């Protein structure tokens, strides 16, 4: 199962943002077959737990069905892990909407990126009869000269009797760096949800005017993406 041969990034945002591979079957003309590929322009890291797994289990059975037919229920168990997770999203704005001889206009490129950012802001998933909220509680990043996951592996969690805090040191070290002679701190913003982490004031002092709410953080990214593509 794969994308149709006649479908391109022009029709498919999924192909544009997350790449594709189309394989060709061997035939009399093409003895070797082959594949047509495009790398993802939006890269997502694995979601990594910030807390250890403590062997929590959820025990299930089909008692409702079994009772209806007078049988004994079947038992099952599922590993459960309630934790904070961290993941990194990297978007190469220069490659959005480009594939071979196809290039979309800047307005369409911008629309696709903006919609993706809006989705991340309210991300959730449906699984096993429940809906889980995956929207971010803490975000850090910006629009840079290079599509690089600067903060991958830098988000660490500390916990004590007062609550949880985000480790500031690793993030501070990143923003103190430079790229092409420009300070990363100048282009970096942070967003936090109130009442979740107890060291909000530390980040407010570190980022000053670039300390925002999560909603305003994404609003700032949308603004800079529009500026990049020259779209109002």
Whereabouts are the PLM-identified features?
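RNA-binding basic/glycine-rich loop and surface signature characteristic of RAMP-family CRISPR effectors
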Residues: 1-232
């Amino acid at each position: 199962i794969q994308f149709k041969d006649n479908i391109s990034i022009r029709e498919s945002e999924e192909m544009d943002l997350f790449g594709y591979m189309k394989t060709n079957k061997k035939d009399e003309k093409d003895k070797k077959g082959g594949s047509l590929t495009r790398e993802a322009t939006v890269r997502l890291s694995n979601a990594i737990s910030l807390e250890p797994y403590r062997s929590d289990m959820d025990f299930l059975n089909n008692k409702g069905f079994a009772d209806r037919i007078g049988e004994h229920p079947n038992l099952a168990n599922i590993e459960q892990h309630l934790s904070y997770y961290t993941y990194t999203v990297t978007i190469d704005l220069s490659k959005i909407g480009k594939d071979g001889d196809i290039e979309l206009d800047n307005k369409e490129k911008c629309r696709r990126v903006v919609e993706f950012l809006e989705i991340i802001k309210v991300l959730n998933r449906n699984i096993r009869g429940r809906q889980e909220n995956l929207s971010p509680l803490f975000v850090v990043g910006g629009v840079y000269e290079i599509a690089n996951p600067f903060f991958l592996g830098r988000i660490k969690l500390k916990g004590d009797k007062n609550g949880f805090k985000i480790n500031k040191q690793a993030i501070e070290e990143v923003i103190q760096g430079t790229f092409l002679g420009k300070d990363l701190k100048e282009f970096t913003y942070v967003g936090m949800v109130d009442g979740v982490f107890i060291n909000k004031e530390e980040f407010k002092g570190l980022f000053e005017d670039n300390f925002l709410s999560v909603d305003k953080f994404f609003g700032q990214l949308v603004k800079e993406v529009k500026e990049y593509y020259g779209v109002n």
